[in-house]
């Protein structure tokens, strides 16, 4: 048995070729020196395939002049930027014990499963990932028999093996279910820090395809593989958590009294309004542009949904300069003696908004199913960090903090 050596020096810095791939014009063809750097915040893992067992080490990839040639480097830079500015916000409100703020991400991965023998007969699916011609099926997604139906045994067997393979790789797969369109399904992982969530989602997409092959199926990650039914997206659930366990996007029971939350909310709304073009561009890949607004949500236009409770608080602040109350959800009475009455949430959940507040996080629903979630989070982190910085600069020099 051959034993290969791998030194600590090689772990910390590697030198792969940095010219033989598209770089958007960052590099001339002859400029070949690049560096990899170990991202020690994302655990290494062992991957077993036909070639044997491979040690996979998450790394950043930069050119000789420092240009980012990957999706990890900009993401880590954006996380560093929002950490710095969000920590300033915490300190302004007396939380001086906070030393670090980390963006948390939980992506929901949608996909289609079809028989592999039928897939191999469709050159359009093989070459483009979607059907280019064909007849509409006699039945599409008009009923709820698929979305709310029992998961078929064959699909359940696939999901079981997929979960097992992902957990072996350290990916915390949690939820799986049918989706709206026939043959469409979804897998969601437990939320974690942004760079780890991005790495995990790449593993999820790769593993989905491998496991599908073993079960005689093909996994389609194209955003719009079939006309007339829903396509596949990747909902990006995003929040900000301190090292002391505080979620900056938790409004609490009385949001109108939570001044820190209202400032954070205002900064996020300002960032999305000012840089809607960047946020839209972060989800712009050909397949996804074909999907957005076609027989499904979200539309291709950026808008924000904050819910009835927060919208009412915002209206109070705009009209009077202060907020005196917050709407409550009240009690839901089922009308059945054997079922309990229970407290409702303060607002309904908007399932179609591209950027919706969902209780203690924002859900960016535009990302395409085949795309990396890195770009969307780079933009989110960066534009919100900019808004935080502007707010912190004003508040730190204000003579009257409460008035400012």
Annotate each language-model stretch with its function.
Residues 227:
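Short glycine- and Lys/Arg-enriched binding-loop motifs that mark or flank ligand-binding interfaces
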């Amino acid at each position: 048995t051959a034993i290969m050596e791998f030194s600590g020096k090689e772990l910390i810095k590697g030198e792969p070729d940095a010219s033989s791939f598209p770089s958007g014009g960052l590099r001339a063809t002859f400029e070949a020196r690049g560096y990899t750097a170990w991202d020690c915040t994302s655990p290494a893992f062992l991957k077993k395939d036909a070639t044997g067992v491979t040690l996979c080490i998450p790394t950043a990839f930069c050119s000789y002049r420092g240009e980012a040639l990957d999706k990890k480097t900009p993401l880590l830079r954006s996380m560093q930027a929002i950490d710095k500015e969000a920590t300033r916000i915490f300190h302004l409100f007396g939380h001086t014990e906070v030393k670090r703020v980390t963006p948390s991400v939980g992506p929901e991965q949608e996909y289609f499963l079809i028989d592999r023998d039928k897939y191999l007969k469709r050159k359009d699916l093989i070459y483009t990932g979607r059907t280019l011609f064909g007849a509409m099926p006699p039945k599409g997604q008009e009923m709820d028999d698929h979305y709310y139906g029992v998961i078929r045994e064959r699909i359940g067997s696939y999901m079981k093996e997929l979960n097992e393979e992902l957990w072996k790789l350290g990916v915390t797969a949690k939820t799986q279910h049918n989706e709206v369109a026939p043959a469409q399904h979804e897998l969601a992982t437990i939320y974690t820090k942004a760079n780890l969530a991005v790495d995990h989602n790449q593993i999820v997409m790769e593993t989905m395809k491998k496991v599908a092959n073993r079960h005689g199926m093909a996994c389609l990650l194209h955003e719009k593989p079939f006309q007339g039914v829903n396509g596949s997206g990747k909902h990006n659930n995003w929040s900000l958590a301190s090292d002391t366990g505080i979620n900056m996007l938790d409004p609490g029971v009385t949001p109108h009294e939570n001044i820190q939350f209202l400032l954070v909310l205002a900064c996020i709304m300002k960032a999305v309004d000012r840089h809607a073009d960047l946020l839209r561009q972060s989800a712009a890949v050909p397949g996804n542009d074909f999907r957005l607004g076609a027989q499904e949500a979200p539309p291709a236009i950026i808008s924000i949904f904050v819910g009835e409770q927060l919208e009412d608080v915002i209206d109070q602040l705009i009209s009077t300069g202060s907020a005196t109350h917050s709407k409550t959800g009240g009690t839901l009475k089922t009308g059945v003696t054997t079922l309990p009455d229970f407290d409702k949430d303060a607002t309904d959940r908007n399932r179609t908004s591209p950027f919706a507040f969902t209780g203690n996080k924002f859900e960016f629903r535009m990302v395409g199913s085949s795309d990396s979630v890195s770009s969307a989070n780079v933009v989110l982190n960066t534009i919100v960090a900019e808004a935080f910085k502007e707010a912190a600069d004003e508040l730190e020099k204000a003579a009257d903090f409460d008035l400012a």
